[in-house]
Amino acid sequence: MTNNEQQKGAELQEKLVQVNRVAKVVKGGRIFGFTALTVVGDGNGKVGFGRGKAREVPVAIQKAMDAARKNMITVTLNGNTLQYPVKARHGSAKVFMQPASEGTGIIAGGAMRAVLEVAGVQNVLAKCYGSTNPVNVVRATFEGLKAMQAPEEIAAKRGKTVEEILG
């Protein structure tokens, strides 16, 4: 890892979403392993998630953090909230996120809350429908955040001004 990457890693917020114990049954008994799901973000629109597997919890968490740093996306925020309401799904997990006024806070549950906190979203109303499996909820949240575009990008694609797009 270069010095620049170490400095970037120091300012990232890290959150552990889930640790799961799994068992492999063999002739002599069970062999236990652990999986970890983590999210990292700079609190300013960059966010990533990762999964790690190992025989011990700390090693699994470290692997997940490393994977999350390699899997970062940039989210275009409108101040400290979302640009517009977003729906997304991954598997059977469906998420709905909508911008909220100043002072609302993050109204979201579990895995979704962790992603939105480290992404730097401070005011949002969010709901999860269908499956609440943390892995699928995190992936669905990422799909929604990835799909969100700034009004400037949409205006440029349509050949209109930002004022026409926003109404």
From Swiss-Prot:
Protein name: Small ribosomal subunit protein uS5
GO MF entry, a single one: structural constituent of ribosome
Subunit text: Part of the 30S ribosomal subunit. Contacts proteins S4 and S8.
Alphabetized UniProt keyword annotations: Ribonucleoprotein, Ribosomal protein, RNA-binding, rRNA-binding
Segments forming domain S5 DRBM: 12-75
Job description of the protein: With S4 and S12 plays an important role in translational accuracy.
Family: Belongs to the universal ribosomal protein uS5 family.
Species of the source: Hahella chejuensis (strain KCTC 2396)
Any Pfam family matching the protein: Ribosomal_S5_C
UniProt superkingdom: Bacteria
Alphabetical list of InterPro entries matching this protein: Ribosomal_Su5_D2-typ_SF, Ribosomal_uS5, Ribosomal_uS5_bac-type, Ribosomal_uS5_C, Ribosomal_uS5_N, Ribosomal_uS5_N_CS, Ribsml_uS5_D2-typ_fold_subgr
Free-text comment on this protein's domains from its UniProt entry: The N-terminal domain interacts with the head of the 30S subunit; the C-terminal domain interacts with the body and contacts protein S4. The interaction surface between S4 and S5 is involved in control of translational fidelity.
Cellular component, GO, one term: small ribosomal subunit
